[in-house]
Amino acid sequence: MRNSFPPSDGGRSTTDRRQQSFPSSSTNRYNSRSAQSSPPLNHCTTWNQQHSQYHNTNFPPNYRRDRAPSSGFSPPVTRARPNFIVQLLHPAAANSDTKLSKKQEIESIALLCEIPEESVHVPQFGCIAASFSFRQWVDARSAVVALWDYRLQGRHDFVPELIPNVVVPSDMDELKDRLRDLFSSHVLSLMENGQGVKKVRMEIDDKSRQVASFSSKRGLKFEVFEKKKALEAERDLVVNRLDEFNNAMKSILRYLIGQDGYEFDVDDEDDEDVAVFSLEGAYDWRRIHYLILRECRRLEDGLPIYAYRRQILKKIHCEQIMVLIGETGSGKSTQLVQFLADSGVAASESIVCTQPRKIAAMTLTDRVREESSGCYEENTVSCTPTFSSTEEISSKVVYMTDNCLLQHYMKDRSLSGISCVIIDEAHERSLNTDLLLALLRKLLSRRIDLRLVIMSATADANQLSQYLFDCGILHVNGRNFPVEIVYSPSGTEENSVVGRIASYAGDVVKMAVEIHKTEKEGTILAFLTSQAEVEWACERFVAPSAIALPLHGKLSFEEQFMVFQNYPGRRKVIFATNIAETSLTIPGVKYVIDSGMVKESKYEPRTGMSILKVCQVSQSSARQRAGRAGRTEPGRCYRLYSKTDFDSMNLNQEPEIRRVHLGVALLRMLALGIDNIAAFEFVDAPVPEAIAMAIQNLVQLGAVVEKNGVLELTQEGHCLVKLGLEPKLGKLILGCFRHRMGKEGIVLAAVMANASSIFCRVGNFDDKMKADRLKVQFCNDNGDLFTLLSVYKEWASLPRDRRNKWCWENSLNAKSMRRCEDTVKELEICIERELTLVSPSYWVWNPNEGTKHDKYLKMVILASLAENVAMYTGYDQLGYEVALTSQQVQLHPSCSLLAFGQKPSWVVFGELLSIVDQYLVCVTAFDFEALYMLDPPPPFDASQMDERRLRVKKVVGCSSTVLKRFCGKSNRSLLSIVSRARSLCSDERIGIQVDVDQNEIRLYASPLDMEKVSALVNDALECEKKWMRNECLEKYLFHGRGQIPIALFGSGAQIKHLEVDQRFLTVDVHYYGDDVVDDRELLTFLEKKIDGCICSIYKFAANKQDCDEKEKWGRITFLTPESAMKATEIQKFDFKGSVLKVFPSLSTGGGIFKMPYFSSVTAKIRWPRKESSGRGCLKCPSGDIHSILGDITSLEIGTNYVHIQRDQLSNDSILISGLGDLSEAEVLDVLEFRTQRRDLNFFIFRKKYSVQCPSPTACEEELHKRIFARMSAKNPEPNCVQVQVFEPKEDNYFMRALIKFDGRLHLEAAKALQELNGEVLPGCLPWQKIKCEQLFQSSIICSASIYNTVKRQLNVLLARFERQKGGECCLEPTHNGAYRVKITAYATRPVAEMRRELEELLRGKPINHPGFTPRVVQHLMSRDGINLMRKIQQETETYILLDRHNLTVRICGTSEKIAKAEQELVQSLMDYHESKQLEIHLRGPEIRPDLMKEVVKRFGPELQGIKEKVHGVDLKLNTRYHVIQVHGSKEMRQEVQKMVNELAREKSALGEKPDEIELECPICLSEVDDGYSLEGCSHLFCKACLLEQFEASMRNFDAFPILCSHIDCGAPIVVADMRALLSQEKLDELISASLSAFVTSSDGKLRFCSTPDCPSIYRVAGPQESGEPFICGACHSETCTRCHLEYHPLITCERYKKFKENPDLSLKDWAKGKDVKECPICKSTIEKTDGCNHLQCRCGKHICWTCLDVFTQAEPCYAHLRTIHGGIGLVELGVPEHPVAQPVHRL
């Protein structure tokens, strides 16, 4: 560092010390002058000698330099005139004449230079900061040199200037030499010891050490090698920077030393052809110093392009054209123009640098002016933002837009006065850029002195080089660090959508969360496509210690600046659009997430439409995004797509000339005389269709006409060329001028160009809703352009100091409004200069009044956009049909027309926006008649379009149940009938809408097709009405097992059928086909085929969890068992090319008696085909062979003693011999028992050749025969068993077979397989025993959402299953992203248990809250309900399942989280339901369309006017649904409703609201209270009256059937009504009453069980039938079905009745022919069958059977027999001697 202190009094000056190294000639020059005076820089000595000669002087402002200044503070005195005056000028003297002088700073400088105080004058104002007066030259010279010395040291920034009143040429030469030496010494010191040079050298040393550390390592990995290469490149870049700095300093030294023959050796290392500075003429010390300062800044800033300066200049000097490729941030845009201006290369005239945007040109101009301040003359750098034919290019460096340069070219086709053109940002390949390149390409051959430089960050350099005559390419390497690329493609489908946000946005948020959790610190930059996605991502990203920031073009400067700020302790996560690709460089970015998508405006030549759509980025853009991560340190880029996707991307962004309308370009080319557009040499030629469509558009606009095959500009076309706007905007302006609405036309063009950014809709959900409310006040019913016009008109009427605040208050973008104002001013100037028209300053259009000007404006807009016409289709779901393409598109949600709730028949739009759907934006309504006033006429047939418009027809009189069934589950039936209608009429526009709330169907079809569609819908409705009338409930009469009668309870509360004979009524329908089946067609087909009546339908879930049974369509119940039997007797039905099969259903009864469903019972069986060798091998687990050997020594298997020995050839095998004909299973059972292990593997060595076996076909038949015979089920179907025997290969040891059973027969299957195990088939040898391996399988599928919610619980459950014996579970993903759990077991019980637990987990817990009525649950199907569920799911980490058909809700998750979610859902939904009851609707068929706007105008966007009048009420306006949400009491709502109704009646054409018709209940004949409409006939009743009718019917059996009481109706009340009106308890009572009535009216054919209160019913046997017993399943009593008494086998009913009447008669009848007598004592009847004549009665008496004598003991009786009767009556029979009499029981 140079010493910053002044030299001491007696020492040599700094300058003198430096002179020692200079040539002697210089020293002699100084010495000759020094002989007369002191050393020049010895300030102290000089002033000590000379100060006495001066008086105390003070210089006032505007003093005369030719005389001594007079003091304004002392009396005028005569002073000596100073010979020399040294002035200090402010650094920005030319720019400031009012800057306050820094008096203290001046005094300190004077003191530092030892200038006497009396010589100092400090003016208060002006460009002169101070002046010093001197009498002696030596003092003046020393002061000037000292002041420059201190300025070079950085002690002050004033510019010293000498004003000599006495001019001596030698004095000036001496001062020049002194300053030259001073500056030269300063330059040398900077080169040797400058602070910046030291830092750079340290940086070089540090990089070299890092490179050396890699060089010492061997075998570098690829990543490390790449890092080494990056460090070497960075080191070389720094070295080149230092070389450039030294070269620049040497250039300055050469200039300083080379003047006047003064020579100095600067040790040039090489002889450069091109000098970096073109310095000539007299020394400008101020400029030289600024050049030095700028070089020092360049060295410290380290812009990459600085290291390539000489290389660039040499290339431009030698070559006419150059392509310069440098990454964003390399300094191309600011430095190259300065390099050229400094060096003089290609700078003989002006240097023009073009930018694609005006703001960029202005910003760069300011930046270059700031950097080069003092280096050039004033106005060297300028900006020409707009073209003017009267202005010339005069500045040395000019920044302008490419559009502006094109205009200059059209004025001067030689570009006179321009020596170099720089096309910047060429990678954007804008339309103007490509046109400029094409025109300059031709110009270069005419002007060989013109230089062209193409600058770009990512452009295809080779393509540009080839186009521009194979010019040279120079790559400027940036300061990037290596970036690791990670390809992480998403698992979601490419086009899937969540809400209105595409799936890739969710993937970006997930990746950001993952990176934040797992990676080290560093900013995350994520690329999305739009403002909506960016804000959505910021809301969804929730992570600790992180802050989510948005970055998109609509943010204010302050909001954008937030991404550059630091947030201590928090990681920045920036979600940005492609604005962050090249426009901005954000420091600290280490991780980049590339979604791979970008939103681009594309012009489709086929349709002539400009569409803004989301598409894939190019490879160059992907690399540019990845490069964001390597600016300050090595980074990582996560690409959410695969490497294959990257390779398939376009190499570069498609040029704008292929993406936009070519109207502007063609106009300019025609103006230039280029008539053969197709042959013009573009860089990338547009497709011929685009050129043709552009010409057609220009013809339509009246700008071009075709004469003799040649295109010519019309007068209007020439005007459009001069305006330089898009033709449609120019046409808009010219059309308005014709109607004397010039102001409106100019403003319309300005706001239309900025339409997307004027309304500011940013922030969270509430902020956006507020912005929507604020917008309503500006909405105009004529469309968006009128709305924007009214906004600008009101904004322009405000004082300038109020405009920003007004924009903030109304959610408007103040920046966009100012941009519109600038555009308006530019257009006004352009119109006045180029078209010589006077732009009016007044408005003639009034947004608050409908006048003829509205019509004029709409006509002008239509003429300007005649090709962008759309017609309302008549169907909201289709929206509008674009006239030229027949596309169906919707109005954008931000469209002003939606604020009025109307869809105009005809609209004209600005462009098509393609996001998730396609939308019309910038829409204006017009009348149909205006199309006939267009000249030329529109390019489509408007009349034909109007004829094709869809008409609407309403179908009323249908109940809500019929409508719901008409729609089907998930609207499947409705979609099917729509599809049939479209196919029938060959019109894809046909639509059918069902409004259940209004009980109506709306049909949308053309007039020709309406009859067909109406007939189709009516047929379907009649089917549904018929099935609703026939609908029955299956009711089991009691709970239990055995024979349970089933009642079919149907309409009219009647029993339609009572099944007591155990015949089946319900069947399962299986559909085997790939196509989606129409349920209604299928049911109608079955009814016709079977000629039966269907009374109940149950459709299995479309995504049911038993995926193995996906062929099961559903279950239907027939009204008679004969129909059901007939359906099952047919093996299969041919239904539209697919197969239908019908099986009896075993799971009926409304859910209580359902048997569990299993997938097919699969058994694998095998039997050996090769005989055993008697030896086998036991494979042991590793390390356990010794313990196993110990367990199985002395082993006996069956009757065989086996020999055990260890296998010498294997460490884990044991050989077992002596097995005989034992099978593997028999041996393994014994081994497992002895070792108590289940991990053994045993196999038998079998002989080489197989024995003769029956054929596989014979085996199949035999197996089927045996298994089917063992099925114990009643009447099993023959196809319930399938057997497949596989053909064996030569080396197979076993025959194998697969057996599948019907899943409903799992118990029978298990029994049959158990009996089959161990059997031998005919034709097989005894050792060929069958081994059965039963495999019971089932599977459950859950969606990815449920799986992600219960993943941890599911894994725990599966792990527990793994530890259990008897079953296995495995989890696997399916092709559609769901997950399947497969259950496999060897018995049904483990399957059932596992499945039950899995179902409980995956199906979730149902919400059984009393407040969860169907009306409340229906809210979950709305958008608000869906958002509520998503919010709760996210907060509680649960998943909510909504059954839309049954209106039930289940929640999946842990028990604690389910409880929390249930509480929040119930509370939130109940609150929402309550709020819905307090809503005021602002649109409807009888409401004025502008009511919402009137409400906002009258009461304010926040409805403050209503709140002030209704105290305590909380209101919120929902502009999308036109609803005021009232939070308060019902009385408050009524007050608000009253105020709104009063406003609605004002100016309303509808007048007063008609009186409502009071409806009368047909039962009570009073006004309906709490009404209910019957489903069958839609008649309205009081609900209480209907309930009373049901109660009366239960008490009176004659009241059945229950019918509608409306006059002339008499329709039976259907089951759906009874379900809706009655509780389950009351419904059971009604069914019981109906059963009683049914039995009573059966004419004795049916009877209740004789047991009191027993609900069972049996059929009475006919006269010719025998009395079969009825065994009651409820009370287990046995009843004769003929006589209804106790069951009496072997006795006729008539005789049994007689026995019942006279029991003795039955005894006598029984005793006939039998040895029967009575006990003399107890009179019991005794029958003797065998034994002796001694009997003992139950009363204890011993009786002689011969004479009936009675004894008290046995011995006397025996004695009596022997004595009286000659023996006991037995001959040695070996029977007991004392038989006991068995009394006969009377019946």
From Swiss-Prot:
Which residues does the record give as Zn(2+) 3 binding sites? 1649, 1654, 1672, 1675
Top-level taxon of the source organism: Eukaryota
The catalytic residues are 1732
Biased composition (Polar residues) is annotated at 20-60
Q: What are the Helicase C-terminal domain coordinates in residue numbering?
A: 507-673
A molecular function annotated in GO for this UniProt entry is: ATP binding
Q: What is this protein called?
A: ATP-dependent RNA helicase DEAH11, chloroplastic
Where is the segment annotated TRIAD supradomain? 1557-1764
Q: Where does Zn(2+) 4 bind?
A: 1680, 1683, 1688, 1693
| IBR-type zinc finger span | 1628-1693
- Residue positions binding ATP: 326-333
Q: Where is the transit peptide?
A: 1-33
